[in-house]
Each structure stands twice: as C-alpha cells, then as structure tokens.
Swiss-Prot record:
This is Potassium channel Cha6605_3372. A motif (RxxxFSD motif) lies at residues 12-18. The record marks 30 as: Hydrophobic filter residue 3. Potassium channel. The channel is permeable for K(+), Rb(+) and Cs(+), while it is unable to conduct Na(+). It comes from Chamaesiphon minutus (strain ATCC 27169 / PCC 6605).
Amino acid sequence: MVEAPEQSETGRIEAFSDGVFAIAITLLVLEIKVPQHKIVETVGLVSSLLSLWPSYLAFLTSFASILVMWVNHHRIFSLVARTDHAFFYWNGLLLMLVTFVPFPTALLAEYLIHPQARVAASVYAGIFLAIAIVFNRLWKHAATADRLLAQKADRHEVDAITKQYRFGPGLYLVAFALSFISVWLSVGVCFVLAIYFALRSNA
C-alpha cells in the first residue's frame, strides 16, 4: 500500500532538494567567462583574468550563501520525520528561488561597476530576502505543524533554530535597503550573513 503524502518519510524530498542545491551551486561557475582572444591579445591573459574580479566576488558570495542554505536545509530535515502537502509546497518554493540565484549573481557580476549597479544589487539582495522569508516559513510550518517533527527532536534545539532563523529576513531586508544607498555595503552584508549563518549552524 502506498503511503499518503502526510505520512511519507522525508528521504525522497531531501534527495531531490540536495540535487537542486547541487545544480544551482554548479551553475554559478558558468557565469565566469573565459577571456576572449581579442581581449587577451590587447591586455594580456593575467590582466584579463584580473578584470573578472566582479564575477569572482559574485560567485564567492553566492556560493557561500547557497552552501549555508543547504547546510541549514539539512539541519531542518534532521529534525523532520514526516511531511505534508504544505511542507512540500514551501520546500518547492524555496527550491525555485534557489535555482534562480545564478541569474542575479550574473547580473551583479556584469553591473557591479556600472552606473546601474544599485539595480543589480537590489535584485541580488532581493532574491536572498525572498529565500530567507520562505526558509523561515518552511521551518515554522515544520516546527508547529502536528506530528512533522521527529520524536527524537530536542525541544530546546527546535526553539534555538526558530530564534536563529527569525533574524534572517530582517537582516536581508537591511541588505536590500542598503542596495539603494551603497552597492558595496549591500553585497558585504550578504557575504557576512552567509558567514554568520554558517557559524550559527554549528552552534
């Protein structure tokens, strides 16, 4: 007999999610383009590679952010024993946003030193703000819905995660607001937040 979605184990959805995270994080490097021969012949290969620093910066920030998301996503699934339809859809929305990250990453890399850099930075910070909101909603549903958490889930750990994740949307909102004032501050906040949540995930 096939199990109902609300009674199913989390293995399939976690495996699918891992694949999506892996693909999204791999696609980031495709936006770092190999210098064209015409440019190399003019300024040299070293200078051409160094001129790609906006792409390196955008790649590093997005890679760190997606990696930390994946770690925290795994953390959620280590505490969840069952899923329901709402959990499926919140997780699906999260994955949709994650797969979109390579686009604002490429946009930021292309326009980081362009007069339209603030627009690119706002799109970049905006996607992570949206991810933070959905991530919180996914966890809130898992933590409060009846019977989704595993019996072994420690209540103190659940409460600690809830408090930790609660700050995410507000902090990314700061990064989004800063994008209209200073591109560098906005991107810097996004990078620092990736480090912050990486450290907190081990707390």
